């Protein structure tokens, strides 16, 4: 199983991809600060 948590999104829309990557990177940065 390659996916732990599916994220429904329109992967053809650049704005959608930018939003998801932004949220993921923010979460990673916050997690690393602890």
Curated annotation (Swiss-Prot):
Highest rank taxon of the organism: Eukaryota
GO BP term (any one): translation
Signal sequence extent: none
Pfam family, one: Ribosomal_S2
Chief location category: plastid
Cellular compartment(s): Plastid, Chloroplast
Keywords associated with the record: Chloroplast, Plastid, Ribonucleoprotein, Ribosomal protein
Family of the protein in this entry: Belongs to the universal ribosomal protein uS2 family.
Name of the protein described by the UniProt record: Small ribosomal subunit protein uS2c
Organism: Ochrosphaera neapolitana
Organism placement in taxonomy: Eukaryota, Haptista, Haptophyta, Prymnesiophyceae, Coccolithales
